[in-house]
């Protein structure tokens, strides 16, 4: 894996996060930070998926969302803004659009070819696979962001000596 592909992936995630952040009325001073957090999280996912280990998208997205959660939690305390202002735009580029699109496409094909002689079980299998993958990826992204929040709070309490 080349560093340029990793940088390009992070750059596109940065642009998407800034776009989502501007739609959601994120303060302009925080938009670059939303982009940077998204680039780090998405590049983490990309590196894990394309490394020699070939980690699947669910676990790689989980690791990327943990990075986003931890960085967003510390940055939100530093900039005195809600956690969601930084984390949600950064998580949105990691939403599995191709799996969601494949789910809807398979469902439409199933209903279109259900009455003909074409075996429609194939489309049901594709629908089930894509729907389960979409739900698992999003579930692990949310859990990863929550793990990031809890980890930063534990670190904060640990550093205080509580």
What are these regions (language model features)?
Residues 85-104:
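Hydrophobic alpha-helical membrane-insertion segments
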Residues 1-67, 71, 82-83, 105-162:
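Alpha-helical transmembrane segments and their membrane-interface boundaries
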Residues 72-90:
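Ordered, amphipathic secondary-structure segments that act as subunit-interaction surfaces
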């Amino acid at each position: 894996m080349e560093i340029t592909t990793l940088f390009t992936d992070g750059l596109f995630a940065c642009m998407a996060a800034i776009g989502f952040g501007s739609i959601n009325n994120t303060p302009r001073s925080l938009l670059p930070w939303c982009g940077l957090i998204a680039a780090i999280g998405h590049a983490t996912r990309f590196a894990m998926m394309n490394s020699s280990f070939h980690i699947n998208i669910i676990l790689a997205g989980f690791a990327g969302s943990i990075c986003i959660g931890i960085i967003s939690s510390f940055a939100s305390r530093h900039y005195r803004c809600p956690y969601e202002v930084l984390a949600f735009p950064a998580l949105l580029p990691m939403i599995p659009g191709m799996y969601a699109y494949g789910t809807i496409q398979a469902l439409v094909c199933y209903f279109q070819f259900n009455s003909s002689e074409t075996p429609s079980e194939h489309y049901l299998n594709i629908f089930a696979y894509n729907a389960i993958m979409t739900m698992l990826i999003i579930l692990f992204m949310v859990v990863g962001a929550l793990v990031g929040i809890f980890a930063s709070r534990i670190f904060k309490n640990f550093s205080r000596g509580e």
